[in-house]
A protein has these predicted regions:
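Conserved subregion of the PPM/PP2C metallophosphatase catalytic domain
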Residues: 1-155
């Protein structure tokens, strides 16, 4: 259970860390023998790029440890993998970054296109490619949030 996996996140050493913030999270597990992916997410989707086509595994639209803990269950989705699929999990920092010629957000549509482009590269080039694209978009704008993109190529 996704909520149980992060039990205690909303406190620090038994003391409340305050606020009404939750945590966005995506968790994935792969059974390499059956090539089956299991995914559960709290506001963070998982993307699978297969032969230049992107599939998005949608998350539940509520955060971990938000407002009333232990009141919501997270859906676990199963997805059959194929060799050379590329999986991406990311925080929302990339899509929420302001930049470009008009100081607008990067947005999900552009991010999805970038993931398809990135998946066509050797996996060892993913980090440099994503970092370059992020910096080019950001330009002189301040970075607004943490940015993490994890990519995995299925052998």
């Amino acid at each position: 259970d996704l909520a149980m996996s992060v039990e205690g996140v909303g406190s620090a050493g038994g003391r409340d860390i305050g606020g009404q913030d939750g945590m966005d999270l995506g968790m994935a597990a792969v059974n390499w023998e059956t090539m089956m992916l299991e995914y559960a997410g709290a506001n963070n989707p998982l993307y699978v790029v297969r032969r230049s086509e992107l599939q998005e595994l949608k998350p539940n639209k509520f955060a971990i440890c938000s407002f009333e803990p232990n009141t919501k269950n997270y859906d676990v989705q199963k997805f059959p993998l194929e060799s050379s699929d590329t999986l991406f999990l990311a925080t929302d920092g990339f899509v929420d970054q302001f930049g470009g010629p008009h100081g607008k957000k990067f947005m999900r549509r552009r991010f999805r296109e970038l993931l398809v482009e990135t998946a066509s590269l050797p996996v060892m080039e993913h980090e440099a490619h994503l970092k370059h694209q992020f910096e080019a978009w950001r330009g002189e704008e301040e970075q607004v949030d943490d940015v993490l993109v994890v990519s995995v190529r299925v052998p």
